[in-house]
C-alpha cells in the first residue's frame, strides 16, 4: 500500500481551506510535490463547485483586426484590416443563436474608427435583435480607449454600456498585472492600476467581468502569483468576478515569441499550466468560485486533466478564435456541446451548460448534435 506522508505543512493546508493562503504559502506549494498541490486544489474545487463541470455555448465575434497598439505578443493586429458593419455583426450573432448559443463575446483591436458611440450602437443593436443572448463584450483596454476617443470618462462609458444592454465585460487585456512586464510586452496598453480601476468601476456599475492571466513569457513566478493575489483583493472589495481564466502565451508569429524561441525558451510546459490552475484555486478559494481550463490554449486532453487539478469549467464552444490561431494555436476553434459532455463525463464529472453569468441552462443540443454550421460531424466539432 502506498502510504507516503504528505509534505505540505499542516498550517499551510489549514490556511488554504480557510481561504487565507499567503504568498509564502503559494511559493511553498509550487516548489513542492505537484501532485500534492493538485490533490489540495481538487479538494478545494469539490468544496467550492461540487462535481459539476460547466461550459457555455457561445460564439466569438471579432469586430476588427485594426489596432493602433503595439503589443509584442499579438499576431492578430494589422493597420490595414477590416471593421465589421452592424449588419455583419448581427448576421454572425444570428448564426450563433441558430446553433444554440446563449452568449456572444464581442472583441477586437482598438482603433479610432471604433469609438464608444460605435460600441454602444453594436450593443444596442444586438440586444434589440437578440434580447435573450448574453452580451459579453469589450476589454478594459477597449473601454478606456473608446471612452477617451469619444471624450467621456470610463465611468460614464460603463454606465452607458450597461444601459445599452451589456451583460458582462471581458477581463482580457490584463496579461500580467505588473507594470514592469507591461512595459515590455504591451507598452501602449493601460497600466496595471488602470486595469484594476476599470474592472472595479464595472463591478460597481453592476457589470460583472471575468479575470484572465496570460503567462509564460517574460514574467517571473512572483509576478504570476502577485497577479492572482491582485484578483483576490479586487474580489474582496467588489465580488464582481465570475471566473479566472489562465491563458498560456502562444509564442508564434509575434515579436515576444520570436525572442523567446531564439533564446531556446518555449511556451509554458503542461506541468506549469496545471500548477497555475491549481495554485489559482488555492489562492482564490472562498472568493472566486470558478476556475476555467481553456481548451483552446491547453488542448482538450490537458484541459480534461486540469479538471483533476482545481478547474471546474471548460469555457465555450467559441466557433472561431482568430487571436489564438494567428499566434500558432493548434487546438481548433470549435468544440460542440456533445464533445464537451463527452469530455466531462470522461473525467468522472457531471456536465452543466451555463451562460456568461454562470446561470444553469437546460441542455438540449441544437440542430446536428450542437454542431456549428460548416464543421464536419466526423471531426467531433474540432476544426484542426
Curated annotation (Swiss-Prot):
Top-rank taxon, per record: Archaea
EC number: 2.5.1.147
Listed InterPro entries: Aldolase_TIM (IPR013785), CofH/MnqC-like_C (IPR045567), CofH_family (IPR019940), Elp3/MiaA/NifB-like_rSAM (IPR006638), F420 (IPR034405), FO_synthase_su2 (IPR020050), rSAM (IPR007197)
Binding site for [4Fe-4S] cluster: 67, 71, 74
Pathway in which the depicted protein is active: Cofactor biosynthesis; coenzyme F0 biosynthesis
Bound cofactor: record note: Binds 1 [4Fe-4S] cluster. The cluster is coordinated with 3 cysteines and an exchangeable S-adenosyl-L-methionine.
Keyword terms: 4Fe-4S, Iron, Iron-sulfur, Metal-binding, S-adenosyl-L-methionine, Transferase
Reaction(s) this enzyme catalyzes, per UniProt: 5-amino-6-(D-ribitylamino)uracil + L-tyrosine + S-adenosyl-L-methionine = 5-amino-5-(4-hydroxybenzyl)-6-(D-ribitylimino)-5,6-dihydrouracil + 2-iminoacetate + 5'-deoxyadenosine + L-methionine + H(+)
Residue span, Radical SAM core domain: 53-286
Sample GO molecular function, one term: 7,8-didemethyl-8-hydroxy-5-deazariboflavin synthase activity
UniProt key word Iron-sulfur: yes
Cofactor(s) for this UniProt protein: [4Fe-4S] cluster
Gene3D superfamilies for the chain: Aldolase class I
EC class of the enzyme, as a word: transferase
Classification via CDD domains: Radical_SAM (cd01335)
Protein family according to the UniProt entry: Belongs to the radical SAM superfamily. CofH family.
Known role: Catalyzes the radical-mediated synthesis of 5-amino-5-(4-hydroxybenzyl)-6-(D-ribitylimino)-5,6-dihydrouracil from 5-amino-6-(D-ribitylamino)uracil and L-tyrosine.
Subunit-level organization: Consists of two subunits, CofG and CofH.
Name by which UniProt lists this protein: 5-amino-6-(D-ribitylamino)uracil--L-tyrosine 4-hydroxyphenyl transferase 2
Organism: Methanosarcina mazei (strain ATCC BAA-159 / DSM 3647 / Goe1 / Go1 / JCM 11833 / OCM 88) (Methanosarcina frisia)
